[in-house]
Amino acid sequence: MTPLSAVATPTPAPAEAADSRFSNTFLRLKKKLERGVGKAIADFNMIGDGDTVMVCVSGGKDSYTLLSCLLALRERAPVDFRIIAMNLDQKQPGFPAEVLPAYFESIGVEYRIVTEDTYSIVKDKIPEGKTTCSLCSRLRRGIIYRVARELGATRIALGHHRDDMLETLFLNLFFGGKIKAMPPKLVSDNGEHVVIRPLAYCTEADIAKFARTMEFPIIPCNLCGSQENAQRKQIKTMLQGWAREHPGRIESIATALGQVVPSHLADASLFDFRNLTRDTLVAEGDIAFDRAELPPASAAVMPTVMQLTDHRTDGK
């Protein structure tokens, strides 16, 4: 196990004049992302005064964007919190170990680089051609928790975004038999660590646009040679198709994650159906025989709806 080096504290970078060379379109996108991150932090009480936030930075577009937004928000936040960027070098072949330290130095953020050869462990345990992501993720999580403890971090920030949350929802629904997504905030099983996902309201498309304009030094995520899980790939393709063909559908599903009605599902651990009697009042009201009130379909969706209606009518 490689011993940890001290946290590096670079000289703060001068205030960037970069915004002046960006288009108004980009500045609106930047503001949109920062507003989304700020709203998620407020909605789920992710960061408080005096917190030390360890931001896990892999070298991908999502974690770069997360770090950028948190640094920007810290400048005007009503609470004071510390940010430490952390990268885990898992000794994957071809990993450019010099990229992230140079980037962290250039923006003046505290950082910690941790080196652990999990790549060799994974390759030894997983047969060739099989997806290594699950074992790799477990090993990485254990190291992240350990480093957070050593740094005294009170929050661990991950770069998962809204699309990741929705993909996880449908993966569990279609292949796991559960209505379960990816929470914006959680506590580790041992109760020691609080994990937050400040990009919970941000879309992958917006993040990708932001990262391209910022010209982050992206490190490829496939250095290990592992392929994306086939099931997740199916879900991603499905959601991308819905986004193209049914405007508003993805937004509606995302909204639904925060509007769960346990009394109208079938999980007895969430709602006490067994002791439900005539005298029991349910907060959601008596709508057992009511049709759900739905918003009117958008103009883009109406032709499809009409075709389906005509088809059903013709088939009677």
Swiss-Prot record:
Protein family per UniProt: Belongs to the TtcA family.
Subunit structure: Homodimer.
EC number: 2.8.1.-
Gene: ttcA
Protein name per UniProt: tRNA-cytidine(32) 2-sulfurtransferase
Cofactor note (record): Binds 1 [4Fe-4S] cluster per subunit. The cluster is chelated by three Cys residues, the fourth Fe has a free coordination site that may bind a sulfur atom transferred from the persulfide of IscS.
Cofactor(s) this protein cannot do without: Mg(2+); [4Fe-4S] cluster
HAMAP family named in the record: TtcA
